[in-house]
């Protein structure tokens, strides 16, 4: 199976745009490959603190205005997760199954839950 390996944060709106764009282009061509292997790059740990919902909201406003107006329909600063660690644990479990389709789908489902459905995936 062909794979594109990316390191990405679950709560980063730029990652959401990039991953969706890759999957959209793949689908437009009627392809099921390459699959994305989305590796953990937790900005919460890199930065030493959780991401700020209002800062993310400002980034989303800019992304919708300039790049992908079709994304982020359900985003809400009020339900933005206070942590990404629970979600990263879930993606790690999906990755351990060895099923690349499942791992990609779980990673995208978590991002869609935050950015398209306005869900707080930081609750344990």
Task: Give the label of every model feature segment.
Residues 1-5:
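Extreme N-terminal starter segment of soluble prokaryotic enzymes
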Residues 8-11:
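Short pre-active-site segment immediately N-terminal to redox-active cysteine/selenocysteine motifs
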Residues 16-119, 123:
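Structural alpha/beta surface segment adjacent to cysteine/selenocysteine redox centers
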């Amino acid at each position: 199976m062909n794979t594109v390996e990316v390191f990405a944060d679950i709560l980063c709106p730029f990652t959401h745009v990039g991953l969706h764009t890759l999957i959209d282009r793949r689908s437009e061509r009627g392809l099921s490959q390459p699959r994305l292997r989305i590796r953990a790059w937790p900005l919460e740990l890199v930065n030493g603190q959780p991401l700020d919902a209002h800062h993310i909201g400002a980034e989303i406003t800019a992304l919708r205005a300039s790049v992908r107006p079709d994304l982020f329909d359900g985003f809400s600063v009020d339900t933005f997760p206070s942590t990404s660690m629970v979600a990263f644990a879930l993606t790690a479990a999906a990755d351990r199954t060895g099923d690349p389709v499942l791992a990609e789908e779980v990673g995208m489902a978590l991002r869609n839950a935050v950015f398209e459905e306005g869900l707080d995936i930081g609750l344990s």
